[in-house]
Amino acid sequence: AAGVVSYGVMAFVMTAAPVAMVNHGHSVDNAALGIQWHLLAMFGPSFFTGRLMVRYGKERVTAVGMVLLAASGVVALGGLGLSHFWGSLALLGIGWNFSFIGATAMVTDCHTPAERSKAQGMNDFFVFAATAAVSFLAGSILHSSGWQAVNWMIFPALALILVPLLWQGRYGRN
């Protein structure tokens, strides 16, 4: 579920962001630059995300990623300036990296070696089906309710994952 939420939240906001930027008076070039920085933020941390998981644990790295995704929403809700859009997109990228890589690594922890390939395949199916759905939904929500609504909508999904992760960290596994 953490992978579905992390990828879904990222795709939902990323899909709407460039359109929202142009709708709020920013140039297409600035919207494109925001997405370029977002992509760097998505993949740049990969050089050390694995080491962070070894040192701090997959659950903690995933939780930090979810918090960064939420911070992205907070920054986006803070205003409509270029710095708000770019800052939000950068946090969205880093948050996705930590949360998605951590979540993906946790999938195989729950299964026997014989089940892992099938579990990973099912996980990927749900992740990318949800991503396709929210990508379509993002445009509709942006058009009908606006950029602020897009960003408010991410918090319940993030809480759905973050609360159990924090609970697990506090009280351990049963």
Locations of regions flagged by a protein language model:
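A membrane-interface helix-boundary motif in multi-pass transporters
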Residues: S140-L158
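Paired small-residue
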Residues: S72, S83-L91
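Short amphipathic helix-loop junctions that connect adjacent transmembrane helices
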Residues: T15-G34
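A late C-terminal transmembrane helix in Major Facilitator Superfamily
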Residues: E115-S144
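Helix-to-loop junctions at the C-terminal end of transmembrane segments
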Residues: G44-K58, L142
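Intracellular juxtamembrane helix-capping segments at the cytosolic ends
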Residues: F98-T112
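Pair of pore-lining "gating" transmembrane helices in MFS-fold secondary transporters
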Residues: A1-M10, A90
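Structural signature of the two symmetry-related core transmembrane helices
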Residues: R60-V75, F155
